[in-house]
Amino acid sequence: YSFMMPNHEHWSKEIKNIILVEENKDIHKHSTVLDEACNVKAKRTPWDSHYRYPAVLSLTKDLIKIVEDFIKKEDFDAPLIKIEECWLNWYNKDNYTTPHNHGVHLSLVYFIDVEDTGAKFLFSKNNCYSLEKKEKNHTRCNNVREVNVKNGTVLMFNGNLTHGVTPNLSDQTRITYAANLVVQYMEKREDY
């Protein structure tokens, strides 16, 4: 499922301001950029960025409302959606994200500033690698799906899907927001 984020220009400005602070940590004497390695081979904020930045919390609440409206409209059995974690990624030239999954009910990626970077968002059908024949004319299997997105696009997908990002080929910073959501059930269900 995908949609265009309402108020994209507002959110883009808010997120870019956070990244500006992160990029100038010596001046501001504040940074949440982490040192430990993960699948994101770029700069990112911590997984709990909704607790650290009011703008990220507001954005997250707006996104959850859109997801809840979609779930209600489509009649999915998901009475309560909770944020598990969210963070910002910014990719400089040659930065990328290795294929991975999150093991949650829903994952979201909000593409804030991605156009003209040459980087592609990819879904993989599985975690297997395949061998290809050396001959010129050989059969190819399609285990990878490239998703073309524009600035302002939000993708919502099963958190178990393997996905990744190819390297940023430009000098322009590629910026995304990512979140993992879980379904929760009330203690007492009203109906089945």
Question: Where in this protein do the model-derived segments appear?
Answer:
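Non-heme Fe(II)/2-oxoglutarate
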Residues: 1-75, 96
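Ligand-binding loop in jelly-roll beta-barrel domains
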Residues: 162-176
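A short coil-to-beta-strand element that immediately follows conserved catalytic motifs
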Residues: 75-86
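Catalytic core of non-heme Fe(II) oxygenases with the double-stranded beta-helix
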Residues: 85-156, 166, 184-192
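Hydrophobic residues positioned within well-ordered beta-strands of beta-sheet architectures
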Residues: 1, 84-86, 106-108, 175-179
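A generic structural micro-feature
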Residues: 80, 100-104, 169-173
